[in-house]
Amino acid sequence: MPQQTDNTRNASPDSASAHPRPPSAQRDSASSGKPVLPIFPGGALPPPESAARKAVIRGVALLALTTGALYLTWRALASVNLAHWWVAVPLYLLEVHSFLGLALFTFSLWEVDTIPAPPPVDETTAKLAVLIPTYNEGVEILLPTIAAAVAVRLPHETWVLDDGRRPWVEELATALGARYLSRPRNTHAKAGNLNHALQVIDADFIAVLDADHVPLPDLFRKTLGYFDDPRVALVQTPQDFFNLDSFEHENADVTATLDGALDDEERIRFSEQTLFYRVIAPGKNRWNAAFWCGTGAVLRVAALRDVGGVATETITEDIHTTVRLHRRGWRTVYHNEVLARGVA
């Protein structure tokens, strides 16, 4: 039988900080020697690109494509050494492959401001839940995430889905005002954990957070408006990271500003994944190609159930589930605003 505790729906966004930490959690945190992770303020939606900026970027892209096409034409007609074709032809095909990658990149990013962000939702009759799958994360990781999830605005339930079946996690979740759920076996890992929760919870929309991703209070307020379109199944937000000592941020200092080195807030905004989450992902909205990135996403439960739940056949259950949703005619959206921050 699944184990679950605490059936209280979180009605007050400010009540989480009043919950004491359980004694076992305090001991675990002290023994780890690691501080509880801070919760940084979130980012904001980037301003729309100006017409002049778009024109310059598109002009440079077209110039690059034209130059590349002329170069490949010259290579094919005058430069490929057919006397040594076993070297020359594969090399030429690699160059063609690179050019096609540039063309596809330009095509997908030609227009990125295609879906205006809806106004924040201040009240809703929908049933909401935040799901936090966990297996072996320590208290210094779980505590900030659970506390912040309980404090997310709009009435909702917070569920800690513990595949580690740890009594202290149940104690921590209960103390912070969250519900606790475990299962007898860890079949299909995270995907199976989420599918098990879908059989238990009563929700119209769920926010899925990795155990190390701390949500910001407006996670639901800024994303629920997209679901006014009954075809929308998923809203994905950027993945961002608040610890500055990881490989994600190791190149931040080489990015200079007019004032010199980046300050901490600028370093927080810069990581290895900035190109994808701030440039490439927004361009996918035009083609209904946004996909679930595993965390920081809000999903329509009815859509998940329509495709048989979270895909379990591969370890990339997020993208696989998105493919299933698209196959069934559902739409997906990328909301280009940081609404959760994690540990890299």
Residue ranges with predicted function:
Residues 2-122, 173:
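N-terminal membrane-anchoring/stem segments of glycan-assembly enzymes
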Residues 108, 181-205, 217-315, 326-327:
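Long helical/loop segments within the catalytic core of UDP-sugar-dependent glycosyltransferases
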Residues 126-129, 157, 305, 320:
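Cell-envelope/extracellular polymer assembly enzymes that use nucleotide-activated donors
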Residues 130-146, 164:
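Active-site beta-to-alpha loop of glycosyltransferases that engages the nucleotide-sugar donor
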Residues 145-156:
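Short, acidic, metal-binding catalytic loop of nucleotide-sugar glycosyltransferases
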Residues 162-169, 185-186:
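A conserved acidic beta->alpha catalytic loop
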Residues 313, 322-340:
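Catalytic donor-sugar/metal-binding loop of nucleotide-sugar-dependent glycosyltransferases
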